[in-house]
Amino acid sequence: MSDKKSLMPLVGIPGEIKNRLNILDFVKNDKFFTLYVRALQVLQARDQSDYSSFFQLGGIHGLPYTEWAKAQPQLHLYKANYCTHGTVLFPTWHRAYESTWEQTLWEAAGTVAQRFTTSDQAEWIQAAKDLRQPFWDWGYWPNDPDFIGLPDQVIRDKQVEITDYNGTKIEVENPILHYKFHPIEPTFEGDFAQWQTTMRYPDVQKQENIEGMIAGIKAAAPGFREWTFNMLTKNYTWELFSNHGAVVGAHANSLEMVHNTVHFLIGRDPTLDPLVPGHMGSVPHAAFDPIFWMHHCNVDRLLALWQTMNYDVYVSEGMNREATMGLIPGQVLTEDSPLEPFYTKNQDPWQSDDLEDWETLGFSYPDFDPVKGKSKEEKSVYINDWVHKHYGFVTTQTENPALRLLSSFQRAKSDHETQYALYDWVIHATFRYYELNNSFSIIFYFDEGEGCTLESIIGTVDAFRGTTSENCANCARSQDLIAEGFVHLNYYIGCDIGQHADHEDDAVPLYEPTRVKEYLKKRKIGCKVVSAEGELTSLVVEIKGAPYYLPVGEARPKLDHEKPIVILDDIIHRVN
């Protein structure tokens, strides 16, 4: 048994396995929503020194860089966050983290339910037992320009309606919009030392710009659907899927890189230069924003989907690239590495190997309801098909054969009878992740001479960072970490030149290298690095076309090794 005793072990939620719900469905359930709001109020009101408080749970991810819930202090620890980024443990560490939050939320909801004095008190108590953290499915987009996947209760409403303990309807201040520090943490620096509450999408005056944030989410939605689809279907190994470290042979974003950009959807305006990050745009401060938990709930859901699709693949060996509170630089990481500061009821550290079956912790997702009790193989086939349907490109523009072809390729079920072949075009960016001291974005946009606007942005590759005077030494130790990200181009190619084909078969040549190079040169792609400091000298950018095909009877595209990957030069213009 470990000698590191935890005062708040992660034991999971007892009883029946219950689903974490999409936030759009969750808010329609009055009992769930009321209990969630009340539980947040309870956690946010707790003294910031209480390990079960909203502040302390958020602080596990970053500042104030203190030990969490340890019975005895541990000596010689790095002054750093606990969270693992850029390593093979990124998905599993955050699974344990999300579940620790969920367990604490669930306990608070149970206490809240006991306060109801109405005749249906038993129903409130049962609802509290069934309550799980909801997720924001930011990868889903139904081809609706006004769809953002978040209800007003999460992003707009300063007051929300809930049921009071006596059964009447009341309005209360919305605890999902912000966390109010009491007091502001003394180790916060810069703007974070001035903001009394968490800040989303700050403008040049350092004020919250919610309508700008919503416009940014809408503009990014089609790209996120394609990024999510490619992340789930083209990363066959744990090394490719798990983190943003550069890997030979990658052709789609990792789970972590897509996750980075979602942080920035809430945490920064990409059109501002220099960058003005809010809390969600800075690693040391991100988990203090209540939306963090919805975001990371979806990160875990995507991990569960990928696990089911690749049921014979799990955590592979990798190198720890930066110091954390629980890991040293250069340490070899495996599925048996401890996930500090999370301990079992037996006071042993949780390990990735313990977390492979997420139901161990008392939750699941609605996506798996149709295949309960099925074999791993049957679940894999079903989820593969479901991912194609849910995240594959869908279009109502049936007059555009190039988009119909793209839709056919991405939405084919495993029993399809046609073999599809298509070049997949991406912008590929590699860079030293710690070259700059804080978060930064690499932004790609059309019509370079016209300037960068939300409407012209094709996509971004984002370094989700955050440096303080206390942890800057970690960056020096991690200088050699090369990260990579991708921006997928086929949707834009299909939209713009697809009208030149009469049928889907005629559209295939439109994705061939010669036509694509001609098209992209005309679109004048600009690239700019937006940060709060200097130039990113390590950045290397290229456009790559990989020949993929979808065999008859399969739902996962395969790289055609008989054809070379094509590199297009002299297309992207670097803008200072």
Swiss-Prot record:
Catalytic reactions of this protein: 2 L-dopa + O2 = 2 L-dopaquinone + 2 H2O; L-tyrosine + O2 = L-dopaquinone + H2O
Residues that, per the record, bind Cu cation 1: H61, H85, H94
Pfam families per UniProt: Tyrosinase, Tyrosinase_C
An annotated GO BP: melanin biosynthetic process
PROSITE patterns documented for this protein: TYROSINASE_2
Superkingdom assignment: Eukaryota
UniProt binding sites for substrate: H263
Crosslinked residue numbers (2'-(S-cysteinyl)-histidine (Cys-His)): C83-H85
Names of the cofactor(s): Cu(2+)
Site note Cleavage, residues: G392, F393
GO MF, one example: metal ion binding
InterPro entries listed in its UniProt record: Di-copper_centre_dom_sf, Tyrosinase/Hemocyanin, Tyrosinase_C, Tyrosinase_Cu-bd
Note accompanying the cofactor annotation: Binds 2 copper ions per subunit.
Biological role stated in the UniProt entry: Copper-containing oxidase that catalyzes both the o-hydroxylation of monophenols and the subsequent oxidation of the resulting o-diphenols into reactive o-quinones, which evolve spontaneously to produce intermediates, which associate in dark brown pigments. Involved in the initial step of melanin synthesis. Melanins constitute a mechanism of defense and resistance to stress such as UV radiations, free radicals, gamma rays, dehydratation and extreme temperatures, and contribute to the fungal cell-wall resistance against hydrolytic enzymes in avoiding cellular lysis.
Name the UniProt record assigns to this protein: Polyphenol oxidase 3
Organism field: Agaricus bisporus
Protein encoded by which gene: PPO3
